[in-house]
UniProtKB/Swiss-Prot annotation:
Reactions catalysed according to its record: L-aspartate(89)-[ribosomal protein uS12]-hydrogen + (sulfur carrier)-SH + AH2 + 2 S-adenosyl-L-methionine = 3-methylsulfanyl-L-aspartate(89)-[ribosomal protein uS12]-hydrogen + (sulfur carrier)-H + 5'-deoxyadenosine + L-methionine + A + S-adenosyl-L-homocysteine + 2 H(+)
Protein name (Swiss-Prot/TrEMBL): Ribosomal protein uS12 methylthiotransferase RimO
Keyword terms: 4Fe-4S, Cytoplasm, Iron, Iron-sulfur, Metal-binding, S-adenosyl-L-methionine, Transferase
Residues holding [4Fe-4S] cluster 1: 24, 60, 89
Amino acid sequence: MKSIDYVNPVKNQVPKVGFVSLGCPKALVDSERILTQLRVEGYDIVPSYDAADVVVVNTCGFIDSAVTESLDAIGEAMNANGKVIVTGCLGKRPEQIREAYPQVLAVSGPQDYQSVMEAVHAALPPRHDPFVDLVPDYGIKLTPRHYAYLKISEGCNHRCSFCIIPSMRGDLVSRPVDEVLCEAERLVRGGVKELLVVSQDTSAYGVDLKYAERPWRDRMYQTRMKALCEGLSELGVWTRLHYVYPYPHVDDVLPLMAEGKLLPYLDIPFQHASPRILKLMKRPGAVEKTLQRVQRWKAMCPEITVRSTFIVGFPGETDAEFESLLDFLDQAQLDRVGAFAYSPVHGASANALPDPVPEEVKQERLARFMAKQAEISALRLEAKIGSVQQCLVDLIEDDIAVARSRADAPEIDGLVHIQNGGELGLKVGDLVDVEITDSDEHDLFGDALPANVVPQQGRALNLQMV
């Protein structure tokens, strides 16, 4: 009997879009929203330039290296495909993009979803796809199924001298609290076990809406950080706060952390420890109060993890001011720290500051800073040996499960290597208690306690992107 290869005529006609997503988690959420709308309208998302009828590049433009990466990605897409639509933060500088690549089809700024869709429609009209109902109600995700970024606002009201985010993303615009909670609920129904709350300034959430009340689950919630956290705690999953500005009312969420309703984790960028440098940065400069608050947070919630970021080599930074930054690390005993050497950002007011620090000095200071924090991190992780940590499995590698504890955000913090993960048959998305047996400067090592595994349910939606 002769076999017949069935060809779906509708599928062959489906317009195909390639997608490149660059930048921070907030840009990743923008990409997820565009991809979801593309699928709802019947476009197929393909993992290569060759298979695509048109390519969308979501760019980053925060620092010079990100601009270079974005321009390189646009060039790669132009060379491989030729039909390219550009969006994202670098899209706020269309002249820079068109000077390099005058043949791009369209350029739009961040979170301008309508302009992206209009450009796609112009280049590639949508066609009916009977399978679009298969798009899950939580949309298309670019993260693994067990965690998701939850963006609560756009833009920022601050004018830090080293930052150009407001010029690219505008002033703060908060999403209504019920809209955010409904999205979180959909994500949890889809299998998400960790919600990572992101914005440019999470602490200021709702100030532009005058903290308006909105209904969700038969009660009223203010559009405010604490009320949002109270609502998210009702969903029974990990909730992690990122990009928290050091306002006094941050203390309001500490009781939720102490009660186990919110992950005991604060991501607060302090940026420096010199009052003069902080003033030049246009950041809060009460360093002694900052140290007091860190100690108060630890007293209120002993399990809290405090992550922060810093800039070394800011214009005018003296040797003494850098030493004060190292002293701050010693006193604050932060758990997780990131740092980078200052570099001028196109359009930032800090570019006009006098007394730039020589590049070799910046790099030497950065190395000393990271070495100091590595010592602190190693001691703080060593203190966890013998404890039991709840962990979320991210990856299975040979016989080892690679997970994160409640103290570790994806991609930026440490890992927990579960030595008996393969033996126990752990899977990505499982929640498991792990007895810690060893540590190094960044990671923990241990064995899972088999009686305390919460398995991941359902099946993941696998979507491979360019």
